């Protein structure tokens, strides 16, 4: 859950609140639908079919199609590494630490975790800190004077300023912030490796639904918190982000900085696992050397890019918009595979479920195309 609400998601929600306030709440809540139905399909592929998405593409579409599908997977992983390193850079900035040296240290430690396969220990250490960051932001929101009537009448109203370039751009960014390509591979791969069966599907779907609702409620709370952050030239200032934790007074920057670094590091760990279950499965590679090569080819250039830029907020929001386009091949294969009798062991998605999946996927793509058009 926390891996899905990562630093880039938090930044996107804070920016949405700073720019549009209550009006972005409706967008966050409506995103429960595509988030649930897309992740539910990934969960079914792993639970009923027993396949990770990358593995299933290789098995049912062959080597060359799988190789082509691996490219957007790799781009997605690279972009996620960029987003997390950018978030960690903001954390270092808030703590007053040297950004380049700090990022280099994070890269070295993360590489050591990858090489030593100490994922579980890292998760146990970082998850509580990351969770506290989200809880702290939520707690800060409660101390502000929120107009409940405005939340209901404007925040939850389906009538919003669609067509406004800034609003539509942030719709695309929020879509990409919660429906991330690598999560499809992580979700399906995790369920298949846990050896879940069709009998476990009801509980698996319930967990996915609860996760989608909690994720978007948290995003909505963060949006409300973002209303109290000042913008500079249409973007929130990294130095002002700690205003989201005003409940901590003079310690806000320290708490936010530590939280950002921990949340970013946790996401790096999860992404490296998702990469193994996506690209390596699609390429039908299982060797340790292949995994290390893929990790270095994705993460090292991402680190370099973040070192070379300085507007981390703009970078992360742009990446969230790009996600909605990069995810297209993954959505296509996921929809086809979950409709395949053989792949799903005779229990594919029903026709109406398939129709809902494609409608939700189309909504993601339309949001992305709109966002990309606004960038160009």
Predicted regions and their residues:
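Juxtamembrane transmembrane-helix boundary signature
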Residues: 27-60, 68-79, 226
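Hydrophobic alpha-helical segments and their helix-loop junctions in multi-pass secondary transporters
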Residues: 131-159, 168-188, 333-342, 367-376
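Transmembrane alpha-helical segments of multi-pass small-molecule transport proteins
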Residues: 68-71, 94-115, 132-136, 287-304, ...
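Membrane-interface loop-to-helix entry segments
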Residues: 105-106, 114-144, 320-327, 359
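Flexible loop linkers connecting adjacent transmembrane helices
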Residues: 12-15, 40-65, 231-246, 342-348
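Selective recognition of specific alpha-helical transmembrane segments in multi-pass small-molecule
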Residues: 26-34, 38, 203-229
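Transmembrane helix-boundary motif of multi-pass solute transporters/channels
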Residues: 1-31, 41, 236-238
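Transmembrane helix-loop boundary segments of multi-pass membrane transporters
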Residues: 14-15, 19, 54-58, 86-100, ...
């Amino acid at each position: 859950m926390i891996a899905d609400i990562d630093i880039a998601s938090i930044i996107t929600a804070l920016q949405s609140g700073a720019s549009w306030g209550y009006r972005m709440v409706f967008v966050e809540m409506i995103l429960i639908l595509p988030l649930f139905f897309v992740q539910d399909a990934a969960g079914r592929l792993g639970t009923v079919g027993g396949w990770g998405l990358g593995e299933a593409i290789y098995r049912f579409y062959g080597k060359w199609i799988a190789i082509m599908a691996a490219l957007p997977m790799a781009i997605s992983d690279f972009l996620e590494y960029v987003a997390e390193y950018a978030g960690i850079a903001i954390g270092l900035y808030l703590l007053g630490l040297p950004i380049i040296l700090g990022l280099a240290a994070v890269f070295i430690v993360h590489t050591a975790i990858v090489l030593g396969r100490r994922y579980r220990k890292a998760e146990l250490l970082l998850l509580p800190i990351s969770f506290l960051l989200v809880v702290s932001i939520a707690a800060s929101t409660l101390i502000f004077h929120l107009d409940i009537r405005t939340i209901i009448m404007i925040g939850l109203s389906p009538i919003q300023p669609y067509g406004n370039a800034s609003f539509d751009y942030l719709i695309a960014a929020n879509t990409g912030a919660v429906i991330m390509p690598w999560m499809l591979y992580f979700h399906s791969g995790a369920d298949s490796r846990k050896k879940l069966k069709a009998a476990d599907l009801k509980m698996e779907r319930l967990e996915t639904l609860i996760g989608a609702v909690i994720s978007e409620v948290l995003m909505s709370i963060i949006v409300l918190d973002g209303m109290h952050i000042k913008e500079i030239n249409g973007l929130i200032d990294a130095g002002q982000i700690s205003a989201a934790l005003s409940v901590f007074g003079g310690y806000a920057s320290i708490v936010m900085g530590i939280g950002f670094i921990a949340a970013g590091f946790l996401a790096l760990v999860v992404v490296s696992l998702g990469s193994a279950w996506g690209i390596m499965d699609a390429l039908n590679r299982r060797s340790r050397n292949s995994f290390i090569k893929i990790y270095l080819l994705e993460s090292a250039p991402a680190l370099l890019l973040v070192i070379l830029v300085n507007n981390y907020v703009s970078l992360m929001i742009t990446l969230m918009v790009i996600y909605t386009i990069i995810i297209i091949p993954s959505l296509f294969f996921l929809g086809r595979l979950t409709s395949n009798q053989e792949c799903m062991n005779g229990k594919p998605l029903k026709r109406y479920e398939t129709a809902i999946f494609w409608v939700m996927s189309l909504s993601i793509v339309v949001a992305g195309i709109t966002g990309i058009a606004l960038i160009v």
